[in-house]
Amino acid sequence: MRKLFTLFALLPFMTFSASAQSILKGDVNEDGAVDISDVVALVNIILNGSGSQSYPSCPDDHHPHLIDLGLPSGTKWACCNVGATAPQGEGGYYAWGETDEKDVYDWTAYIRSGGTEESCQNLGANISGTQYDVATKMWGNSWQMPSSEQIKELVDNCTCEWVEYNGAKGMKFIGPNDGFIFLPAAGYRDGSNLFSRGSGYYWSGTQYSSYDYCAYGLFFNSGISILYDYDRYLGQPVRPVAK
């Protein structure tokens, strides 16, 4: 009991990566809820002598926030997906170049084509920040879809860890400065169905260089994280970056 009392007496003098405001509110792990997980987080901080956290440290619950990963380009990534209210949220699923969700995702329903892959409109090499960018439309001009180069930079410069956060499985990307983001393995939509929940499929704003009907995106599962290309009609989440 004396040891426990001493630990709590030292609490005000210890250094934490969690914000002081969050600790005072009881939301130690800054996940937006005060529950038993905060008790566990506080005990780990005290007993392990470490204030390091496992997930993005947002200053409040008013997402999105910018997360600095220490990437060479200086690119800052959003803490959550377009349409999500927290890092673990899947958010919306969007066809490439469309800015609204819908019930069916196929070539016929894809408004940027005439109903077939051959009739896809060429929207330009990179739609990031344009009228076709769902991040810019939904969040404003300070945000945009990442380019394929920014996704490649993320993959090449971050340590990837497969983790579970608030019930959501996904990938934690840890940057050179130990900043990090969590991307839920939200799957993708094809037709009227959701497929491959447990893997991550995220759009970039960059059209595929060889075929107009494809665009680049991020793919990851528990074993790999790579830049890949997808048919543009598919419904996939978007994780924005700052302009």
Where in this protein do the model-derived segments appear?
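Hydrophobic side chains within alpha-helical segments
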Residues: 6, 38-41, 153
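Alpha-helical segments with a strong preference for the paired helices of cellulosomal dockerin domains
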Residues: 22-54
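C-terminal, surface-exposed recognition/capping segments
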Residues: 56-65, 69-243
